[in-house]
Design a protein with these regions (language model features):
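N-terminal Rossmann-like dinucleotide-binding module
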Residues: 1-44, 232-233
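Beta-loop-alpha module in the N-terminal Rossmann-like domain of NAD(P)-dependent dehydrogenases
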Residues: 18, 36-91
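C-terminal helix-rich "cap/oligomerization" subdomain common to oxidoreductases
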Residues: 48-53, 205-235
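A contiguous active-site-proximal alpha/beta segment in oxidoreductase catalytic domains
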Residues: 79-126, 316
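N-terminal Rossmann-like FAD-binding beta1-loop-alpha1 element of flavoenzymes
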Residues: 237-262
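Glycine-rich FAD pyrophosphate-binding loop
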Residues: 256-277
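Dinucleotide-binding Rossmann-like beta1-alpha1 core, especially the glycine-rich loop
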Residues: 279-358
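Helical element adjacent to the flavin cofactor pocket in flavoenzyme catalytic cores
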Residues: 360-382
Length: 382
C-alpha cells in the first residue's frame, strides 16, 4: 500500500506533540518538517500538510497548499475570521481536496451542557477565546446551529476570572469562564473525562480519509463566527490608517490580539506609497547618520521583517550605495563613517562621482514587492 506523504509547518510545543503522534500512525511517511519562518513553500510535494504555525499564518499557508493540490490539516483556529475560513472551505471543495481543522469531536458526548471552564496560566486572552471556539463553542453546534439571534453578557467577577454568558434565541444559555491566574496545570472542563489519545485518533482518521470532513468544517465555521462575535464585544474595535507595511503589520498583530480591526488606505491598493516604491530594500539605517537610535531601530526591525515576511525575501546581501555630497551636506564623510562604525554597520569605500566626497558599498536585504503585497493581502484577509 502506498504511504501517505506528510509535511509539517511548525516546530513549537504543539508541533512537537503532533510529530510524536504522527510517528505512531501506520502507512505514513513524514517527508519534511519546517519552522514557520523556514522556506515551507519550497519543500517537496506531499499528500498532506500539517499546519501548526502561529495563528496569523494559517490562512496564507492553507491557501497556498489548497491551491497546489495538497490536503490540509490545520491547528485551531483555522483562520481568525469566518469570511477567510469560508473562502478556504470553498477552495478545498473546488479542488476536491480534504481540509480539516483540529477539533475535539471525540468529547462531544461527555461535555457539560451549559457550563464551561477553561483555566490556563499565562498566554493571551484572544488566544483563549480562539481555543474556546473549538473546545467549547464548537460543541454546542448541535443545539444551536443558528447564531443570527445571539446576545452576550459580560459578568464582572470579584476574582480575576473572566466570565461571560451567551444567549441564543433566548433558548440556550451557556456560561463560559477562563482564568489567567491559574497556577496549577492547565485545565478545561472536558479534558479529565476522556483517557484515550484523542489527538492520535483524530489524526489517524483524518489522514486516512475516514473523518467527517464536512461536519468538521461546518462546526469550525460556526465556532469561528461565535469567536468573532465574542472578541468584538470583549476587546472592541479599532482603526489603522495607512496600508503601508507598518500599518498592515500593526493591523494583523492587533487582529491576533482579538481586536476587530478596520484598515483604511487613501490609495486604491495597499503598499502604493513608500513601502511599494522605495528601492525594495529593508533599510538598515545607513541613511540616518545623525541618529544612532534610529539606526538601531532599523537594524532590529530588519530582523523582524525578515522573520515575519520571509517568503518575500530575495537576497540578504544585495549591493546598495550611499554617497556624501561635496556641497551642502550636513554630515561630512568622516562623520558618516564614524557613525556607521559606532552602529556596527559594514561598509566599503568605492569610486565616487566628482560631486561627492564619499561613496560606500553596503549589503542590505532585497525583497520582492509583488510577493510582499500578496503576503500582506493574505494577512489582512486571514
Amino acid at each position: 500500500m502506498k504511504k501517505i506523504k506528510v509535511g509539517q509547518i511548525g516546530k513549537g510545543s504543539f508541533g512537537k506533540k503532533l510529530l510524536s503522534k504522527l510517528d505512531n500512525i501506520k502507512n505514513l511517511s513524514i517527508e519534511w518538517v519546517c519552522g514557520s519562518q523556514d522556506k515551507w513553500w519550497k519543500q517537496k510535494k506531499i499528500d498532506w500538510v500539517i499546519i501548526a504555525s502561529p495563528n496569523e499564518f494559517h490562512y496564507e499557508q492553507a491557501k497556498y497548499f489548497l491551491e497546489n493540490n495538497t490536503n490540509v490539516f490545520c491547528e485551531k483556529p483555522g483562520t481568525l475570521c469566518s469570511k477567510s475560513l469560508k473562502e478556504l472551505i470553498e477552495l478545498s471543495k473546488k479542488n476536491n481536496l480534504n481540509f480539516y481543522i483540529d477539533d475535539v469531536l471525540i468529547y462531544e458526548n461527555i461535555t457539560p451542557t451549559n457550563n464551561f471552564v477553561y483555566k490556563k496560566w499565562g498566554g493571551s486572552s484572544a488566544n483563549i477565546i480562539d481555543r474556546m471556539a473549538y473546545h467549547h463553542f464548537y460543541l454546542i453546534y448541535n443545539e444551536v446551529k443558528d447564531i443570527d439571534d445571539i446576545n452576550i453578557k459580560i459578568i464582572k467577577n470579584k476574582t480575576n476570572n473572566k466570565i461571560f454568558e451567551l444567549n441564543f434565541n433566548n433558548k440556550h444559555i451557556y456560561k463560559f469562564e477562563y482564568d489567567f491566574n491559574w497556577h496549577k496545570p492547565k485545565h478545561h472542563s472536558i479534558s479529565p473525562q476522556y483517557n484515550g489519545d484523542a489527538l492520535e485518533k483524530m489524526l489517524t482518521y483524518v489522514l486516512h480519509g475516514q473523518a467527517d470532513f464536512s461536519l468538521n468544517l461546518q462546526r469550525s465555521l460556526f465556532a469561528t463566527k461565535i469567536s468573532e462575535y465574542v472578541k468584538k464585544h470583549i476587546y472592541g474595535k479599532c482603526a489603522v490608517v495607512g496600508a503601508g507595511i507598518y500599518g498592515i503589520t500593526a493591523a494583523t498583530k492587533l487582529k491576533t490580539k482579538g481586536f476587530d480591526v478596520d484598515l483604511f488606505e487613501a490609495e486604491d491598493d495597499i503598499l502604493k506609497a513608500a513601502s511599494g516604491i522605495n528601492q525594495y530594500r529593508i533599510h538598515r539605517g545607513y541613511h540616518y547618520p545623525r541618529s544612532l537610535d534610529t539606526i538601531k531601530s532599523c537594524k532590529d526591525n530588519e530582523q523582524s521583517f525578515i522573520k515575519y515576511y520571509n517568503q518575500s525575501i530575495l537576497d540578504r546581501n544585495s549591493k546598495h550605495y550611499y554617497s556624501i555630497a561635496t556641497e551642502d551636506s550636513l554630515t561630512t564623510a568622516e562623520q558618516y563613517l564614524t557613525v556607521l562604525d559606532k552602529a556596527g554597520l559594514e561598509w566599503k569605500i568605492v569610486d565616487t562621482l566628482p560631486n561627492c566626497d564619499l561613496t560606500i558599498e553596503t549589503k542590505e536585504t532585497f525583497y520582492n514587492p509583488t510577493i510582499l503585497k500578496n503576503i500582506c493581502h493574505n494577512r489582512i484577509k486571514g
